Amino acid sequence: MDIATGPESLERCFPRGQTDCAKMLDGIKMEEHALRPGPATLGVLLGSDCPHPAVCEGCQRPISDRFLMRVNESSWHEECLQCAACQQALTTSCYFRDRKLYCKQDYQQLFAAKCSGCMEKIAPTEFVMRALECVYHLGCFCCCVCERQLRKGDEFVLKEGQLLCKGDYEKEKDLLSSVSPDESDSVKSEDEDGDMKPAKGQGSQSKGSGDDGKDPRRPKRPRTILTTQQRRAFKASFEVSSKPCRKVRETLAAETGLSVRVVQVWFQNQRAKMKKLARRHQQQQEQQNSQRLGQEVLSSRMEGMMASYTPLAPPQQQIVAMEQSPYGSSDPFQQGLTPPQMPGDHMNPYGNDSIFHDIDSDTSLTSLSDCFLGSSDVGSLQARVGNPIDRLYSMQSSYFAS
């Protein structure tokens, strides 16, 4: 952080190498130089003794004017010496910061320090108290809990931009250590603890069993029980602002009859609770989205697998129709029975006459009708064969007669 140097006195003078007679006028040193007539030396003629012209700090050009301005051991043109904010010419004093010049009014408006307690500007003539990078008025440098003004040599803690004296900081540390931020309320209400109040013995036993691994010399931590009205007031204020200012906390403490520190701790725990709930809700949303995405991917894969196979035709019930035929139309000897010998020649049971035409004979077939039996031949064949049942009876009688 640059520290402004100023106000700087302005010097108005002539270039070097000339005789002068000086006088002070309103803080400006005015020097008037007159050239002394006389013969020029050899060094002046050769240029080795000629002084180098001064360079303006504002425009970085050499100054060839009769007069120049001197500020903070740097040279300026008269027209270049002006405020960087309001462009007004600087005549008596100025403020220098970041290689720029400012008048007093603009410098105080732009770069004046502000009190970290009341956020008001600090005048250059005021005494201040510093804590790290924060600057305070003397009256604003006090504890935010007990409002006791801190003096030189007092021990204090700067936490989240707020000043705490040593005593209040130790109380806050003990109170925060006694409260778990994972609970819904660090200070419970009476209606929530209604079921637990009659079991005092069980509560003391459970508390003792929970503290078995801890230091027994440590004193019991204080515990505050809130009523329903107090919780409602805190929640209503929390809905308006999760980080109330000190005045709001003091008002709540006065309305509920609690200390300001208890109110502050409740708001801290409530903020931690809301952050935890938001984090848990976000995790649930991410888990649901991942499950939904997995189901969609699985269903799409199943559809792709099913689409690669052709659908099978539905099974058709084949009904075999059993044709009922008369006994005479079927072979009576299909069941493996040995047919009895027919009377006469068993090789030619139907006689010696040929039923079919002899295809291998010399006579050729003149037409397709020659290959089939004529109607007369069919009738003679049926007369020759007769009824199969009658033939069966005749065969049986001939068998037993022999």
Curated annotation (Swiss-Prot):
Subunit note: Interacts with DHX9.
Domain of life per record: Eukaryota
Purpose: Transcription factor involved in the regulation of podocyte-expressed genes. Essential for the specification of dorsal limb fate at both the zeugopodal and autopodal levels.
Keyword Oxidoreductase annotated: no
Entry's disease: Nail-patella syndrome: Disease that cause abnormal skeletal patterning and renal dysplasia.
GO biological process: dopaminergic neuron differentiation; dorsal/ventral pattern formation; neuron differentiation; positive regulation of transcription by RNA polymerase II; regulation of DNA-templated transcription; regulation of transcription by RNA polymerase II
Name recorded for this polypeptide: LIM homeobox transcription factor 1-beta
Record's compositionally biased regions (Polar residues): 326-338
Localization terms from the record: Nucleus
Tissues expressing this chain: Expressed in most tissues. Highest levels in testis, thyroid, duodenum, skeletal muscle, and pancreatic islets.
Mutagenesis / variant outcome for changing R246Q: In FSGS10; decreased transcriptional activity
InterPro entries for the chain: HD, Homeobox_CS, Homeodomain-like_sf, LIM_Homeobox_TF, Znf_LIM
Gene (UniProt): LMX1B
Organism from which the protein derives: Homo sapiens
